Amino acid sequence: VSFNYTEFKDDGSLILQGDAKIWTDGRLAMPTDPLVNNPKTTRSAGRALYATPVPIWDSATGNVASFVTSFNFLFVIRELKYTPTDGLVFFLAPVGTEIPSGSTGGFLGIFDGSNGFNQFVAVEFDSYHNIWDPKSLRSSHVGIDVNSIMSLKAVNWNRVSGSLEKATIIYDSQTNILSVVMTSQNGQITTIYGTIDLKTVLPEKVSVGFSATTGNPEREKHDIYSWSFTSTLKEPEEQA
């Protein structure tokens, strides 16, 4: 599977859920835009998923896909006097996934705190330090999450509000290593990696996309300007 959005269009190739919108200038906004449209809205969640399911492993062969995805995005704080909340995630989840009930704020639109079973692999770009986050982390951090809002691994993220960020996420199925490289417009670079066997966590086909949330009141907007994704799953060898 391979696709590349240099700008976003409302052409049906993305499934929008909750408070998400594609603007005419080509950006994908989640939430729609608290700075302009919803100044009094509290606790919002929006998601955007690629409409075509992505094969991530093959039960017949045991082969697992490798993938690389890159995207440019922007966080803007509504008012500097407020603490920014809450963040953006790139995630893989079962086909048909919906926004869980009660998953706004720190649950980032992917985690249902009332349900003991959550199925996803995610990279979070979090702007708020919640009680489940390690004390060593500052408010802004990048984490790798597997079926839990408590990160498998996390590192501090030196971000600046209004700075364009570029994230590249690579999964190598030979080593099971998921690596993340963040490059900020201000020159800061953030890296993190973790080991995940996708076939033990996810079904054979998944949805891929983004989720973003705000807290109470909405204090931050998240805009995505471009997104590319390429996955490679080795085909079964033909019998002679």
UniProtKB/Swiss-Prot annotation:
It comes from the Eukaryota. The keyword Manganese applies. Mn(2+) binds at E124, D126, D133, H141. CDD domains: lectin_legume_LecRK_Arcelin_ConA. Ca(2+) binds at D126, Y128, N130, D133. The keyword Calcium applies. InterPro entries: ConA-like_dom_sf (IPR013320), L-lectin (IPR016363), Lectin_LegA_CS (IPR000985), Lectin_legB_Mn/Ca_BS (IPR019825), Legume_lectin_dom (IPR001220), Leguminous_Lectin (IPR050258). Pfam families: Lectin_legB. GO terms for molecular function: carbohydrate binding; metal ion binding. Keywords: Calcium, Glycoprotein, Lectin, Manganese, Metal-binding. Glycans are attached at N4. L-fucose specific lectin. Belongs to the leguminous lectin family. PANTHER family: CONCANAVALIN A-LIKE LECTIN FAMILY PROTEIN, OS10G0129200 PROTEIN. This is Anti-H(O) lectin. It comes from Lotus tetragonolobus.
